[in-house]
Regions:
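Signature of N-terminal electron-transfer/Fe-S-associated modules in redox systems
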Residues: 1-167
Length: 168
């Protein structure tokens, strides 16, 4: 449980029509066992205590199943670990003295609402419509009567494991 000191470069933007930019914060004495979102909570507590506005970021379950915590960390969706959501990323994956750049998705369909929060409405509509399948395929056959190869079942499992974060 070592202490960690980081420099954070965080995208700040007041609203969808306002210009945004990176603002730098130093944060110290972080527990390496805390999650990335807990680190942002600590930063926000420090900002509020000093009279500054907290960083707006989206989250819901904090269990890696909802996809609301999506952000880009050091140029990668969700951060340095593949297959790990932002809320499941722990500070032990960073080194003391690191500079961590945090920004919202950079996609035209996801306009920034404030700081790290984006408008996910277009993506949510796709998910509500059943994903990317837009062809009427008729009624479903009996799933137990059709042999499925391992490579196809692996792909299907990957699709079923989607949490709707929008990183794809």
């Amino acid at each position: 449980m070592a202490d960690l000191n980081l420099t954070l470069k965080i995208w700040r933007q007041d609203g969808p029509t306002e210009p945004g930019g990176f603002k730098t914060y130093d944060i110290s004495d972080l527990n390496t066992h805390m999650s990335f979102l807990e680190m942002l909570d600590v930063l926000n507590e420090n900002l509020v205590n000093s009279g500054d506005e907290p960083v707006a970021f989206d989250h819901d379950c904090r269990e890696g199943i909802c996809g609301m915590c999506s952000m880009v960390i050091n140029g990668r969706p969700h951060g340095p670990l593949e297959g790990t959501t932002t809320c499941q990323l722990h500070m032990r994956h960073f080194n003391d003295g690191d500079t961590v750049t945090i920004e919202p998705w950079r996609a035209k369909p996801f306009p920034v609402l404030k700081d790290l929060i984006v408008d996910r409405t277009p993506f949510d509509r796709i998910i509500q419509a059943g994903g990317f399948v837009s062809v009427n395929t008729g009624s479903a056959p009996d799933g137990n009567a059709i042999p499925i190869g391992k490579d196809i079942s692996d792909d299907a499992f990957d699709a079923a494991a989607c949490i709707g974060c929008g990183a794809c």
